[in-house]
């Protein structure tokens, strides 16, 4: 049985023959018999210091899925130094940092300022596949810091207060310092959280539209509904703005994985014969791709597929995880 003939799009050189014409169509079409290869999008979250950056940058370089280069968005201050990245992985990264702007008129002191939402959207919507030939992956480190900065920016600018209230001086927001100075600090109010959450969801939406694999690093937080029980209703996940957004943020991503340090006791053989064995406590780096307790995780798999990486204990290099992930068929199209 032959595949159905798809309608053809119009092109700048003129309409194609043999099918309907959609002038400047804002949609694409593909034959279901030969779908495009699936791109990986994942949020990796966990407490600070568990090795998330080393994990997301230890990719199987040079493979068809991951490419030989990755765009590494060093949003966390200091992450551009790549100290948390294994030396052998650093040459494969193209480091991108948010750019500060100089503010200050003639005769005024010049200061460095940044609009975090604007800068993040510039990065999220850039054509990285064209800017970095050979790159098939974008890594954002980290999403939590971006969310915190957006919330502060929304509060400091008073974006959620109506212009009429500002003119009348009816704004009830608590603030510290001069509003015209970069040092000004305002205490966020409830509408600020709503605005910042909306901004994060929009950033996340555009980021996932990149024609690349997308990996985002976050720290962890949890949401317990008022009146809910600790066991059944509390949801742990990646931290962004507030806690009510956690389930909503996670649902948009195909993969949400949690990293943690788990303490284990191992037996150590004696150095000399006849001496008793000893026991030593060690920290193991563990990645979970399925829910454990309140901590939510998920992994995309083909229909009927089995998750062989529900719990993964890291060796000296996280590249082994990614190779097993690719070999297992997880993350591929249905």
Positions of the model-derived regions?
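N-terminal pre-Walker A segment at the start of P-loop NTPase domains
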Residues: 2-33
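Short regulatory "switch" loops immediately downstream of catalytic or recognition motifs
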Residues: 58-62, 96-102, 152-155, 221-224, ...
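Conserved P-loop
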Residues: 32-140, 144-149
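NTP-binding/hydrolysis catalytic cores, primarily Walker-type P-loop NTPases
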Residues: 297-334
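Glycine-rich, flexible loop segments associated with nucleotide phosphate handling
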Residues: 112-116, 134-137, 186-191, 244, ...
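A generic local structural motif
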Residues: 28-31, 51-53, 201-202, 243-244
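Phosphate-binding/switch region of NTP-binding enzymes
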Residues: 206, 212-312
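P-loop NTPase motor core
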Residues: 137-248
């Amino acid at each position: 049985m032959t595949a159905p003939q798809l309608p053809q799009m119009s092109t700048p050189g003129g309409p194609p023959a043999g099918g309907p014409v959609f002038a400047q169509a804002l949609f694409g079409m593909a034959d279901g018999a030969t779908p495009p290869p699936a791109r990986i999008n994942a949020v990796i979250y966990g407490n600070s210091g568990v090795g998330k950056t080393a994990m997301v940058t230890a990719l199987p370089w040079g493979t068809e899925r991951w490419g030989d280069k990755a765009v590494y968005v060093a949003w966390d201050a200091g992450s551009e130094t790549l100290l948390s990245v294994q030396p052998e992985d650093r040459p494969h990264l193209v480091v991108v940092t948010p750019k500060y702007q100089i503010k200050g008129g003639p005769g005024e002191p010049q200061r460095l300022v940044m609009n975090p939402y604007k800068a993040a959207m510039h990065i999220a919507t850039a054509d990285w596949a064209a800017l970095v030939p050979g790159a098939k992956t974008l890594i954002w480190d980290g999403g939590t810091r971006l969310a915190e900065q957006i919330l502060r920016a929304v509060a400091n600018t008073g974006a959620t207060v109506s212009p009429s209230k500002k003119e009348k001086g009816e704004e009830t927001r608590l603030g510290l310092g001069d509003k015209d100075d970069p040092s000004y600090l305002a205490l966020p109010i409830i509408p600020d959280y709503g605005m910042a959450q909306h901004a994060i969801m929009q950033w996340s939406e555009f980021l996932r539209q990149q024609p690349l694999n997308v990996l985002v690093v976050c720290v962890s937080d949890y949401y317990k509904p008022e009146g809910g029980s600790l066991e059944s209703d509390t949801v742990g996940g990646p931290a962004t703005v507030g806690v009510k957004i956690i389930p909503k943020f996670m649902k948009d991503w195909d993969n949400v994985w949690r990293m943690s340090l788990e303490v284990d006791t191992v037996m150590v053989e004696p150095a000399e014969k006849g001496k008793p064995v000893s026991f030593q406590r060690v920290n193991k780096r563990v990645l979970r791709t399925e829910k454990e307790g309140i901590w939510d995780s998920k992994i995309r798999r083909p229909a009927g597929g089995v998750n062989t990486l529900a719990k993964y204990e890291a060796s000296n290099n996280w590249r082994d995880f990614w190779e097993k992930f690719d070999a297992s068929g997880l993350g591929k199209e249905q």
